[in-house]
Amino acid sequence: MRDRVAMMLRPLVRGWIPRAVLLLTVAFSFGCNRNHNGQLPQSSGEPVAVAKEPVKGFVLVRAYPDQHDGELALALEFSQPLAATQEFDTLVRLEQDSGNHDGGWSLSDDAKTLRYPYVEADKHYTVLISAGLLAATGSRLGKPRKEPVYTGELDPVVGFASRGSILPARGSRGVPVVSVNVPEVDVEFMRVREKALPAFLARYHKAGQRSSWELSNQGNSRKRLSELADPVYVTRFVLDGKKNERALTYLPIQSIRELREPGLYFAVMKPTGSFSDAFETAFFSVSNIGLHTRAYKDKLFVHTASLRSGNPYKQVDLLVLDAKGETVLQGATDDNGNALLNYTLNAGHVLVSRNGRDISILPFNQPALDLSEFAVAGRENPWFDVFAWSGRDLYRPGETLRISALLRDRDGKPVKPQPVFLRLKQPDGKTFRETRLQPAEQGYLEFTQKIPSDAPTGRWRVEFRTDPASKEAVQGLAVRVEEFLPERMKLELSSAQPVLRAKAPFTLTADAAYLYGAPAAGNRFTANLAVAVEQHPLDNMPGWFFGDATLQLPRGAKETIDITLGADGHLVHDIVLPEEAKPVSPMAVVVSGSVYESGGRPVTRSLKRVLWPADALVGVRPLFDVASGADANGMARFELTRVGVDGKPQSAKGLKATLVRELRDYHWRYSDGRWDYDFTRRFENKETRTVDISTSHTTTLALPVEWGDYRLEVFDPVTGLTMRYPFRAGWSWGDDNRGLDARPDKVKLALDKTSYRAGDTLKVTITPPHPGKGLLLVESDKPLYVQAIDANPSTTLEIPVTADWERHDVYVTALVFRGGSASNNTTPARAVGEVYVPMQRKDRRVAVGLVVPKQMRPAQSLPVTVSVPELAGKQAHVTISAVDAGILNITGFPVPDAAAHFFAQRRLSVDAYDIYGRVIESFEGGTGRLKFGGDMALPPLPQAKRPTARSQTVDLFSGAVKLDAKGNAHIQLPVPDFNGALRVSALVYSDTRYGQRDAETVVRAPILAEASMPRVMAPGDRSTVTVDVQNFTGKQGKFAVKVEGVGPLAVAEAGRSVTLGIDGKTTLNFPLRALEGNSVAQVRVRVEGNGSKAERHYDLPVRAAWPQGLRTQAHVLNVLAPIAFDPALAKGLMPDSVNARLSVSALAPIPFASVLQGVFEYPYGCAEQTASKGYAALWLDDATIKSLGIHGVTPAQRLERLEGALGRLASLQTMNGHFSMCGGNSDVNPVLTPYIAGFLLDAKDAGFAVSDAVLQKALNRLSEDLLSGAHLFYGNDQSEALMFAHQAWSGYVLARVNRAPLGTLRTLYDNERGKAVSGLSLVHLGVALSLQGDRKRGEAAIEAGFAKSEGGRPEVFGDYGSVIRDNALMIALVRAHGLAKPAYEARVMALGRDLEARRRSGWLWLSTQEQVALAQLGRALLVDQKKQVSGTLYVGKQREEIAASRLIGRSFDAAALARGVRFVPQGDVPLYASFEVAGIPRQAPVSDDSQLLVVRRWYTVDGKPWTPGPLKEGQALIVRVSVTSKQNMPDALLTDLLPAGLEIDNFNLGETRQWADVTVDGIALSERANAADIKHEEFRDDRYVAMLQLTGGRTANLFYLVRAVTPGTYKVPPSLVEDMYRPALRGTGRVAPATVTVVQP
């Protein structure tokens, strides 16, 4: 070889010397000519313009073969979009008689390209295009076209045809490979080391395409493939297949000697001559062992069967490997192929079964068999049980939650009395309260909790545990907390049609009545109808998809009925289905019917029916996780079936199944000052197959997919319908494991009885999908019975029922195994059957007699008699609940049933794992030939501060009442003044027996007077009080009706007289006007006649349509001259809202009192706000309240607020000790932790009960942050300064309890103090150093802190602070710890100047941090204050002598200010006086978009912009609020007050599904959560509130629904958005229209 290279080089060497001489000569000649550029040519060349005429009009641009991923289509591209309604199959044809397919030509999304997929490669086609082909513009092609197209050859492609990993040892032809135009492949085989099996199977879950990086990378602590497996063989295979045809070839690995050693092999394949980075991979073991396992609590049942015959496989060795490959357990199966191992399942372990050369491997990191089609659901079955109940499941904030419960074992029998730990959780999952309950007599538990008036709305949960540290609750009860009004009417919708048919009307029946017993005579009834594609028309077929999911239907609901009900409140109406409801797909037809109270408030119910387009439908069930999608570069697997309306299978012949891929053509566009991209869709038919379906079993379909969007289309030639199922491939990052290939075939099981008891014989009939050997098991949390069976159709077997079965989690399981054979293309399989075995418990349910009056009058006692003869002479109790049916109907709350709970089916507690879903399938195909061989992973937003109305909710409860010796109980329940219906329910319990019964009592007065009005009004609003008066006195009479307003309300035409017959009714409307004010007014209705009278009182809040503000004025008194309150401070404010305060002291003019009360009443409750409100409650003791002149704060309120803050903070604490900002999944900001921990220490020092666990966890967190360098605050421009501030504050809090290491504090001062940008962080560090003993460094740090320039602090720093907050805290800290110096006091005056500057710039907005800091400063100053002030206070002519104190404070209302307020001080000057006025302006705030742009728009329910005009009662609108911030705002708060006559349709309660598909400006309401980063939202009586995170420059869109309810004209409030921690950052939206008018229809 060396000689050959030398010979090749020799001529080059020989020619080198002469050439060198020549070059040297040339070089010298250039040097003589002095041409520095050598022979560099001049620039030349002329551009040639290519003449390209633009395409004009409607023409064919090109005809071409469109090939992608081995699939062909003829494509015709036109210059303009085509009209989509044409019959393309008649307008465009192939000249060759190839048999055009119906629906063969498909139109792309941009409508410019037609595609025809039914063509072959390497063929010439001629396409005939009709001159009549129509463009969307109306133009026609004009002349026929004849276009030749040559399809060319298919691109080469190859891959493994199966995702399986078990190759049957007997009767298998090898590993299947599918290919197109690939004649040969190179394959390398590697054997996985046994100890590496767990690591390998954790990384490689299934076959698929992998890159070289995936195969060799060692990232994320994973080993390279070479460290897991050894190369054993490399070879080349010659594949079958004709040119341009897909071929299936088996690689005959059984004949390769190097692959005969038992083990798991990994195969890597590539086409010969290919140098792509993508490799096809598969792994497999060759075995005849079928492995099935069943995992119990501490046992593992193993059954081994022959993959060839299905018979039991005897004496198979078993061993379990842990994650490191070490053997942790070994055993063997018996002669029946069974083994029961003492083993608890671990997902990181692998089970290896071996017998001779057979080896099967089962990793436990795969999902258990999917048994969702079996009735195996239920709750867990622990040793004890709790049945919890309440009278209702819907509460308003401020009401009292009452829960009852029974402690029993899992069969409803008594247990030894022991404490039960209850946890009340908020909607965000955080614990609100935790308490210990001790069972009373017969295991009865009772719990009550007042729901705070500022409680977050949503689903709360009550959980029970016997171990308070347990993460898992044994039982729970969900309740809803929402602002609602009880319904006054009931409405039932029904239809005799089980399904709908096209062109036939939907016959709707409606029955409406008042809950107090009168029919809804003359009431308005409306109904809206919405249609949508129904992909799940059969409830008994979960997981199956039907119909055409791509079908576009009109979004939103259409009004179909608007009618007045007759005298009986009954209606039968035929609704004509809309034109869009064509028989092309099953459709959900939803009717939403509403009956209206006289005042306009609706009661709404929905009814759904499914429109069937044909007698039978084709359905598909994806064999992958629907949410994650199919795997890319693999096979997407489906099951197909065809069923009738009754759900029974039907056969089908000649179904056309087509895999369609969606392709997107992206293009960039410049819009709104920036580049963005858009795309158009086009679709390619990838593969079409003909499929037959039988009635006995489903058909499986496997289709190759890459990464992207697809849909499966199945055309049924009998019905002419096409089922379309869209799906994605390759979108589930990090979830390349498993899918739903673990779904087994189904064995039908039928029991001979409905219930059993020990001693019975159970007979079970087995109907398998195929005959075979198998097992019959009885299981609970352990195997109770195992028997080998021969399963044939209708096989009946008997099993003795033993005492072990006397529980409620017993199931009969049947396993039937089918052997496999390559000769008949049968793959080994197992089928599973499950049926629950109910135990006989009828004798433990008792009959309950319940006697209540059918009708009674209000304000009387309701007599209830309970009789349970079966419990006579036995100890038993009963609880009675009587609840307004108008509350229960909102949620459909069922009657509590203890027997149904205790004896209910529990979930199957067995998880099954096996290898049958991973057996490599047998297909038809050729055998490859060896070419050569070789050897090579909320905040709660409590209701905003406003006057709040009391809403009457009737919920009566007796508690536990003991039955007498005869089994009877007599109970009286006091019924309030209320008209309606009470559902009276009784729950009876003894030690082991239970019963329940309910009845209804109508409550109504002789004269019924019920009023309707808005939930709230704003000053200036005009509305209507609607009063229904009905005569139930039993005789005709004349009745005087009087309506009056108390407070800021005016009622016109307040007195009326009406004559009513027996049971006669009239509706009266009284004009109502809201006057100026800000309080809870009342509407009082009084009706007298026929010797009876009725009087009703209704709270009606009158509140402004915008928020209040604070005005301040400060004075320095250098002489003892009288000072007077300037009435101008209250100018322009609503008098009823004015709250003025005068403060006089020797302290600086800082509004201590107002900020303390302001933060105490702050309405929202994130972590920082909760701690701040807690501070206010902590400091507002009696002495402070008195000295500051604060009104309206009682000791009880203070204690409730403080305890609520402590409980709320405990619920917000995370596992690592920090605190979640707003609960749930909201962010954690570490800078809050020292602030909150400091509050907890202060509360503890004040003697309040603080959870030591919460406090210690927070202190431990601070200690770790101080020692480890704290949080790095990535993304913050001042990250180092913020980290220093956090460490300094943490060190200060720890130093208070002597837990701050002095060495760490010194290091922080010596090395890091230069990073401080605020003086506060240095003061925190200095105080900490001083407390821990280093006074010298401490004083130096404090001095440096006060020397810091106030301007050095960034406006946005990330610590919720400000210059005002920092200055106040700095002074308060040094004073509190005796480190103050006179030089520092200058900051106090600076504070006063800052506050005055803010006041002069407009309203004085202060954040909660600023308010708390100012209050803390005030307390510190008062402690050292020696000077006192006294004087005389004059209010008008009233005089009050005020004794000397350090601070004088008094509060006044608008009337006092009008009379004149003057104070004559006494004391040593200088003195400081401050005047503060809080109130609501008469005029609306002007729109302000300087920081935030807030835009509110209104839309109709079909998503179109609403043109302002009168709204009809019941008319719904969609509200969209768009918020754009100029800067990032992580804590924005939107408050959108409603016009008074409108009410929110609460998404948590209402029938809103008919609006889900409505689209507003391209955003579907069902996707509204993605239109803004909403942390929490609430639907309140009079407002929509949302906390959200805003990103600078981007727009957030929020949506909610409103409905016009009460006639009148109402002011439209502006939308307000503010930063909760930087209140100066706010935006006020423009009001348009200024008013909204609601009219009667």
UniProtKB/Swiss-Prot annotation:
Record GO terms (molecular function): endopeptidase inhibitor activity
Cysteines joined through disulfide linkages: none
Endpoints of the signal sequence: 1-31
A Pfam match: bMG1
Protein name (Swiss-Prot/TrEMBL): Alpha-2-macroglobulin
Principal subcellular localisation of the protein: membrane
Lineage: Bacteria, Pseudomonadati, Pseudomonadota, Gammaproteobacteria, Lysobacterales
Function: Protects the bacterial cell from host peptidases.
Lipidated positions per record (N-palmitoyl cysteine): 32
Cross-link (Isoglutamyl cysteine thioester (Cys-Gln)) at residue(s): 1166-1169
Keywords attached to this entry: Cell membrane, Lipoprotein, Membrane, Palmitate, Protease inhibitor, Signal, Thioester bond
Taxonomic source organism: Xylella fastidiosa (strain 9a5c)
InterPro entries xrefs: A2M_bMG2, A2M_N_BRD, A2MG_MG1, A2MG_proteobact, Alpha_2_Macroglob_MG3, Bact_A2M_MG5, Bact_A2M_MG6, Bact_MG10
